[in-house]
Amino acid sequence: MSKKNLQYFMRSTQQEVVTVPGPESFKDEEGKVIDFEIKVLSQAEIMKINDMYRTHRPTRDKKGNPLVMNNEIVWETERDSARASRHLIVEALQYPDLKDPDLMKHYNCVDITEMPLRVFPRADEYQFVTRIVMQALGLMSDENADNAEIEDAKN
């Protein structure tokens, strides 16, 4: 048996940046689709952002008293997954930088989680950007690859 070497698990800490074509509605002076740059976030960063939009509080009865079951307080957890996913988009997109103060001022926006909705106001643009970012982060599978696998399985 070969010697176990932990060197294989010592990965580079440099962040990976993926370049993908943006939506058809964003073109440069020459009419070419603008490329978006997406930083691949670590699982720890993704979990930290998701935890920011999770609230944990005691469940209350109709009188406003905490609900107790088996001598323990029953906790209620609420998640704002839409806002968390918009925050993930902002953190992952390097170009366009949605946290840029000039861009935020242009859209009269003070909350970074509102920027994806302002910069990509059309539903098709927003869905496209959400899909490419989530695929780059590994949170969503590539539909084309899935369809190809299904076609291969059929044949």
Predicted regions: what they are:
Residues 10-27:
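Short acidic, Pro/Gly- and aromatic-enriched capping/linker segments at domain boundaries
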Residues 30-155:
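Short, surface-exposed, charged amphipathic helix/loop patches that serve as local interaction elements
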